[in-house]
């Protein structure tokens, strides 16, 4: 699901809100989440999951085109850990 599909679906389910209002709320929520992670803080949405930063240590990588070794710096990357309710709902899906 893309962001625009999410906005469309929420606007349909919440008839009292316009698509523009839903779009604004989604954009503001995502911006706030990004700002919180930028500040090094953790985000927890009970039943859904938590977002945090994990440190990825420096390592030697490989350029896929040339095959040459490349030194990669250490960096922080976003990490999502699903909550218990979300895990249970996904586990119940029969694919």
Curated annotation (Swiss-Prot):
Keyword DNA-binding: yes
Coiled coil: none
Domain of life where this protein originates: Bacteria
Disulfide-bond pairs as recorded: none
CDD domains reported for this sequence: IHF_B
Gene Ontology MF annotations: DNA binding; structural constituent of chromatin
GO cellular component, one term: chromosome
Any one GO BP annotation for this protein: DNA recombination
Location of region: Disordered: 56-76
Keywords of the record: DNA recombination, DNA-binding, Transcription, Transcription regulation, Translation regulation
Record function comment: This protein is one of the two subunits of integration host factor, a specific DNA-binding protein that functions in genetic recombination as well as in transcriptional and translational control.
Subunit structure: Heterodimer of an alpha and a beta chain.
Family: Belongs to the bacterial histone-like protein family.
Protein name: Integration host factor subunit beta
Source organism of the structure: Shewanella denitrificans (strain OS217 / ATCC BAA-1090 / DSM 15013)
């Amino acid at each position: 699901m893309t962001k625009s599909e999410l906005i469309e679906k929420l606007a349909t389910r919440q008839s009292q809100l316009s698509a523009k209002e839903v779009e604004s709320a989604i954009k503001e929520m995502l911006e706030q989440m990004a700002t919180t992670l930028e500040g090094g803080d953790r985000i927890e949405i009970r039943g859904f999951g938590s977002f945090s930063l994990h440190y990825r240590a420096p390592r030697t990588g490989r350029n896929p085109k040339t095959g040459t070794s490349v030194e990669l710096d250490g960096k922080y990357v976003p990490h999502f850990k699903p909550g218990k309710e979300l895990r249970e709902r996904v586990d119940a899906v029969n694919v």
